């Protein structure tokens, strides 16, 4: 079973669909942790209601790579296999992308122009 780590900054609407797909066994995965850089992001509430471990990490007054290293530690703590970016409104550092090479998927609700 794939252990998912979710990074999100917004409502996390797509998280609901992923939870439903897991519950109906359409998706053979487990959401191990949800991390947000926005304290009041509804994605954290979705995680709480569904009893998914969740963390808030502020990105303010911190260099991008240091922020990414804090996220990295949490993802390792939960033995994450694959990261889903669901409305994550931060640009990830080159370092983070190398560490998680081919293990990051960006979920975007529409086509970009």
What does each model-identified segment do?
Residues 1-113:
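One-carbon transfer enzymes
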């Amino acid at each position: 079973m794939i252990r998912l780590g979710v990074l999100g900054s917004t409502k996390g609407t797509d998280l609901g669909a992923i939870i439903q797909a897991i519950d109906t066994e359409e998706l053979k995965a487990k959401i191990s942790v949800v991390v947000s850089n926005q304290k009041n992001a509804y994605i954290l509430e979705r995680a709480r209601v569904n009893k998914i471990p969740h963390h808030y990490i502020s990105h303010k007054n911190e260099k991008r790579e240091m922020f990414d290293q804090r996220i990295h530690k949490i993802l390792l703590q939960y033995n994450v296999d694959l990261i889903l970016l669901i409305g994550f409104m931060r640009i990830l550092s080159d370092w983070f992308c190398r560490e998680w090479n081919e293990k990051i998927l960006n979920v975007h609700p529409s086509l970009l122009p």
